[in-house]
């Protein structure tokens, strides 16, 4: 009688036979499908039950499958879990040990990618990266490897002493992928045709192109635009540069036209060379600022860290001193409550003060940039273009303070900046810096001056209040930024004296928040002041969103302006899926009040088609109506619209997308991000990618996933619920880690053709033995004969395919047959046929 691994309700013989027929071929072929019942029970069957066939032929030896996790050796696509944490997914080769259980083979390079201290283990350090390790347990004592075949999951347990301790979110630089060679262009084209009641007509077009070429780690980029109206048309090159990453420095090297970061001095454009650190190359948990938490555990303990009442970190630590440097703070301020729970249950607590400003760095982390070249003037400005050099650095001194500063110099301009930022504990975070600049203009007038800057930030979790204030003060009218210093014909009589900016937000109760923001600038030599103030309230209740906003502005060369707006947004899911209706009222000084009604929504299974209808009317009876739609396809996004009002009508149109030239051909795509992926489905068309609406492989089997996160693991999965009927995939998920600007390749091996249940008989017309292994002589695809001599095959076409069937090692225990589908179009997704094996 069959035996169950787990207790459960009893099955009838008929039910058991059905389970055998459906599940065993799946397990034996390595499909990775779990053979379970509705109650998720796993069954074990004694092979003795299966040793007799209808034909009386000797069956295949299935004794190896009587042991848990025992399967056929080979290469499997598996999820790798290391110490109960998923670390990657890749193809691993398995061999059978003396107990017929599968054990994994690793190369030394793969062990290095897993974070094993290869160079510190003598038995591994002396081997090349391509060397194969058959038994990891013999090299690293205490290691265990278990292959969960049903879930295609390889569980590794490796002592912590043999592993590097990596920060959360860490991805080994050995996995950073430069990508494959490519040429591409990103384009955005828009146009409009305006017709006026008087009979006039105007047309405009605009084309934005971001072009690129990748070869190895190098990235060549060009940004150009084209504009056209009724009178003129023009091409403009915005910038061109060559860039690559420097992994050892976690930095980017750039040659060409770009702009400085503006972290210390005001940003400006240049032509030259720049080397700057890239925080994207750091693990997620080490970006930005967070303090290093240190303490001492008296035993094996659990350390829990809370911020604003939420647990943001929890980990097991050994007895003795510990250090935690990979926190993800939940907000910019809010002290950290650290709890140490010892093995006997006793607890100790202490408070780690915490507040942060944007420039603050973690203890010991250096962020820098070094730039040299020629200042690059704006296209329409009258400016000189001197040679210059700039260097900036920001260094995390400790848990409290960050130091920063910079130098900038050219023939007629010198600037020095220095500052310090720090946490004030419960009082928030504060930074103060001072810049001195010496400037000489073409008319030999010389100036020098100082700029003081103070920034303050504070979160008050008890009241859900956020406060941010910045104050700039210029000691005299002689301070000029580098942009201002290079501008000819400068108005020296309008020099800024000070500026204050503030932003306050307050959550008053769940779903409702208030905000206030504003700024004021005043100037030397006059009493003029520019002011801008905004206040508002917003919230959401029962799915209905609302906001009320007021803005006041005053500028020296303009009249005071006041504006009030009210917005309501109501979901229509009950009547019209994925749609909302909204109302907006806008009242502005000296202008008629305007009312607008709008309907927005999306259609098709993944929202690829979006639409909007809008009607507006003001108090002077001016009206405007519009209809717009856009469609997001694998080859780009297409949009069109029409609007008309009292005096005019307008047609508008546009298309955005990308064109990618790669080693296998040309693929059209949606608009590309910084890094992207080329999907290769081995010629299968219509294969969709999860979480990327509109993305599907083209008739050649290629698609482009337009945006990925650089230096982090990205999961690319096929939407198996919408696979074409003639496509089977060997694996449905790939993980990629692209470098900045890279196009990485993700290949999904597809069997293209039809699914067939073929009854195979021997030369005497008798069914082949149950459990015999059938292999495709060309593709290597495998299947298992069931108890009726039936094989499940996929990827079958009208072209004849040769298969070899084996049920032993003797010459009379194997045969061959050929099979193909009819030339006519099949009417079902799973065909049936017969074949004779010789």
UniProtKB/Swiss-Prot annotation:
Signal peptide: 1-40
Swiss-Prot/TrEMBL GO biological process terms: DNA damage response; pilus assembly
InterPro entries reported for this sequence: Fimb_usher, Fimbrial_membr_usher_CS, FimD_plug_dom, PapC-like_C, PapC-like_C_sf, PapC_N, PapC_N_sf
Record's bilayer topology term: Multi-pass membrane protein
Induction cue: Expression is negatively regulated by H-NS and subjected to cAMP receptor protein (CRP)-mediated catabolite repression.
The entry's keywords: Cell outer membrane, Disulfide bond, Fimbrium biogenesis, Membrane, Signal, Transmembrane, Transmembrane beta strand, Transport
SUPFAM superfamilies named among the record's database cross-references: FimD N-terminal domain-like
Main location: membrane
Protein name: Outer membrane usher protein YraJ
Species in which this protein is naturally found: Escherichia coli (strain K12)
């Amino acid at each position: 009688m069959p035996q169950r691994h787990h207790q459960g309700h009893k099955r009838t013989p008929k039910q058991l036979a059905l389970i055998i027929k459906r599940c065993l071929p799946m397990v034996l072929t390595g499909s990775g499908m779990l053979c379970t019942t509705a109650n998720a029970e796993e069954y074990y069957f004694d092979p003795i039950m299966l040793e007799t066939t209808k034909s009386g032929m000797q069956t295949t030896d299935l004794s190896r499958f009587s042991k848990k996790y025992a399967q056929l050796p080979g290469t499997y696509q598996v999820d790798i879990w290391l110490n109960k944490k998923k670390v990657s997914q890749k193809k691993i080769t398995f061999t059978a040990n003396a107990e017929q259980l599968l054990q994994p083979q690793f190369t030394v390079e793969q062990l290095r990618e897993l974070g094993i201290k290869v160079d510190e283990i003598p038995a591994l350090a002396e081997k090349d990266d391509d060397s194969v390790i058959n038994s990891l347990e013999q090299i690293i004592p205490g290691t265990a490897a278990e292959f969960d075949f049903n879930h295609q999951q390889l569980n590794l347990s490796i002592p912590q002493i043999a592993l590097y301790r990596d920060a959360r979110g860490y991805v080994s630089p050995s996995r950073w992928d430069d990508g494959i060679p490519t040429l591409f262009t990103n384009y955005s084209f828009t146009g409009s045709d305006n017709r006026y009641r008087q009979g006039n007509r105007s047309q405009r077009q605009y084309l934005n192109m971001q072009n690129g070429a990748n070869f190895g780690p190098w990235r060549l980029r060009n940004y150009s635009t084209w504009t056209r109206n009724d009178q003129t048309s023009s091409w403009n090159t915005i910038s061109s540069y060559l860039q690559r990453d420097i992994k050892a420095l976690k930095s980017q090297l750039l040659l060409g036209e770009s702009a400085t970061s503006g972290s210390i001095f005001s940003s400006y454009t240049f032509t030259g060379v720049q080397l700057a650190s890239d925080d994207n190359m750091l693990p997620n948990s080490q970006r930005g600022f967070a303090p290093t938490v240190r303490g001492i555990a008296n035993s094996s303990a659990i350390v829990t860290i809370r911020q604003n009442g939420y647990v943001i970190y929890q980990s097991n630590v050994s007895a003795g001193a510990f250090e935690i440097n990979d926190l993800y703070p939940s907000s910019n301020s809010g002290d950290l409550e650290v709890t140490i729970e010892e093995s006997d249950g006793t607890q100790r607590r202490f408070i780690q003060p915490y507040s942060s400003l944007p420039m603050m760095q973690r203890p010991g982390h250096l962020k820098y940039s070094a730039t040299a070249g020629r200042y690059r003037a704006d296209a329409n400005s009258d400016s000189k273009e001197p040679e210059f050099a700039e260097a900036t650095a920001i260094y995390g001194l400790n848990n409290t303070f960050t130091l920063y500063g910079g130098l900038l110099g050219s023939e007629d301009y010198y600037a020095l900046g220095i500052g310090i930022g720090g946490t004030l504990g419960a009082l928030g975070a504060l930074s103060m810096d001072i810049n001195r600049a010496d400037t000489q203009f073409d008319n030999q007038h010389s100036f020098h001056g100082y700029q003081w800057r103070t920034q303050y930030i504070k979160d008050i979790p008890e009241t859900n209040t956020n406060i941010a204030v910045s104050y700039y003060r210029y000691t005299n009218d002689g301070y000029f930024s580098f942009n201002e210093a290079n501008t000819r014909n400068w108005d020296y009589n309008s020099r800024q004296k000070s500026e204050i900016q503030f932003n306050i937000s307050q959550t008053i109760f769940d779903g409702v928040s208030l905000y206030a923001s504003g700024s004021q600038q005043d100037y030397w030599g006059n009493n003029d002041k520019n002011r801008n103030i905004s206040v508002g309230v917003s919230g959401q209740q029962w799915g209905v969103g609302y906001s009320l906003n007021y803005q006041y502005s005053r500028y020296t060369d303009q009249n005071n302006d006041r504006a009030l707006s009210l917005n309501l947004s109501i979901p229509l899911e009950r009547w019209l899926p994925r749609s909302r209706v909204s109302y907006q009222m806008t009242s502005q000084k000296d202008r008629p009040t305007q009312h607008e009604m709008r309907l927005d929504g999306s259609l098709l299974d993944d929202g690829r088609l979006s639409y909007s209808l809008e009607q507006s009317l003001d108090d002077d009876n001016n009206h405007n109506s519009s209809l717009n739609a856009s469609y997001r396809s694998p080859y780009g996004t297409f949009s069109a619209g029409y609007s008309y009002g009292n005096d005019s009508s307008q047609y508008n149109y546009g298309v955005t997308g990308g064109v990618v030239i790669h080693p296998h051909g040309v693929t059209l795509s949606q608009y590309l991000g910084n890094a992207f992926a080329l999907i290769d489905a081995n010629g299968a068309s219509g294969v969709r990618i999860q979480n990327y609406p509109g993305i599907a492989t083209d008739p050649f089997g290629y698609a482009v996933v337009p945006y990925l996160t650089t230096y982090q693991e990205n999961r690319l999965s096929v939407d198996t619920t919408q696979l074409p009927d003639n496509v089977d995939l060997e694996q449905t998920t790939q993980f990629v880690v692209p470098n900045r600007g890279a196009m990485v390749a993700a290949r999904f091996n597809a069997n293209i053709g039809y699914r067939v249940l073929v009854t195979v008989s021997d030369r005497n017309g008798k069914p082949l033995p149950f459990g015999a292994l059938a292999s495709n002589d060309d593709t290597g695809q495998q299947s298992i004969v069931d108890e009726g001599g039936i094989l499940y095959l996929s990827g079958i076409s009208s072209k004849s395919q040769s298969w070899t069937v084996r049920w032993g090692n003797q010459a009379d225990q194997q045969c061959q047959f050929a099979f193909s589908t009819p030339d006519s179009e099949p009417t079902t997704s799973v065909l049936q046929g017969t074949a004779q094996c010789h």
